[in-house]
Every structure is written in structure tokens, then in C-alpha cells.
Amino acid sequence: MALLIEDKKQIVAEVSEVASKAFAAVVADYQGLSVEQLTTLRVEARKLGVTTRIVRNTLAKRAFQGTQFDILNDNLVGPTILGFSTSEDDMGAAARLFEEFAKTNKAFELKAAAFDGKVYQGADVSVIANLPNQEKALTMLASVLQAPISKLGRLITALKEKNESEAA
């Protein structure tokens, strides 16, 4: 079905707005998936705060102009679904969602992802997918900071016990 110019402009504006607020974007080929499978993907995306769109490639290229995701334009070939991580707390959510979905749906193929001005092709999308969310990152930081303090505490206790045993 042919889209009217007004409809195309609206789609470009919507995608451009989401892209300008997103921290990461993922591009995947959905050819061969059923409507039911795509609906499942979209439901999971909503749960994670990920925005997904199926847009014509030329419209996506126009929408990406002036955003950090214009570096993905070379990957906009064939049937394409876009995923955007818009949550500051979980910047890798879209990549993680698409990667997990690709594991269970062989027809779903990751093309590329963009994060922080860099493009990750195919299997390298896992770099973004493995980014910890904010809670996990803070937990990792706390454990790294806690380890030296624990060692110091054990050292002081050992020295105290040694001094007590020598005094006795």
C-alpha cells in the first residue's frame, strides 16, 4: 500500500523523535517470522521499555539524519525491524532483547547495533547486550570497592590475634 507524503513525514518524525532520545539502537531482519512471533517480540519489548518499529528503510534513513544512529544506514537493507533502548537505567535492553529473541527464532537475524557512536555488526551486538543495567553496574562497583576493605579487616584481625598470642 502506498503511503501518502503526510504519512511518511509523520513516520519519519516519530522515528526521529525516538532515535533522538535513545541510547542504543538495534537493526534486525525479521523476514520469515509470523505475525504471532513479531507480536511476542513487541510485547516483550514493551515490558522492558524498548521501542520497536518496522519502517521502510528509506524512511528510517531520513529519520536517522542528525542523530547518532545515522551510522546504521548501510545496514538498512531488506525487511528491517528497529529496536531502541530509551531507558537510561538499561542502555543494552534492545540489544539483549533482540539477541535472546534471535536464539529462539532462527529466522530473526541481527544485522547491527549502534551505541556511543560505534556500530557493532552481527555477532558483535552481544557487546551491547552484555552491558549491565544500572542496578547490576552499581552492585558490581560495590563489590569491587568492598573487596579491599574486607581484606584490610581480615589483616587487622589477624595482626590482633597474632599480637594477643605473642603476649600470652
From Swiss-Prot:
PANTHER family: 39S RIBOSOMAL PROTEIN L10, MITOCHONDRIAL (PTHR11560). Forms part of the ribosomal stalk, playing a central role in the interaction of the ribosome with GTP-bound translation factors. Part of the ribosomal stalk of the 50S ribosomal subunit. The N-terminus interacts with L11 and the large rRNA to form the base of the stalk. The C-terminus forms an elongated spine to which L12 dimers bind in a sequential fashion forming a multimeric L10(L12)X complex. Belongs to the universal ribosomal protein uL10 family. This is Large ribosomal subunit protein uL10. One of its GO terms (molecular function) is structural constituent of ribosome. CDD domains: Ribosomal_L10. InterPro entries: Ribosomal_uL10 (IPR001790), Ribosomal_uL10-like_sf (IPR043141), Ribosomal_uL10_bac (IPR022973), Ribosomal_uL10_bac_type (IPR047865), Ribosomal_uL10_CS_bac (IPR002363). PROSITE patterns: RIBOSOMAL_L10 (PS01109). Keywords: Ribonucleoprotein, Ribosomal protein, RNA-binding, rRNA-binding. GO terms for biological process: translation. GO terms for cellular component: large ribosomal subunit.
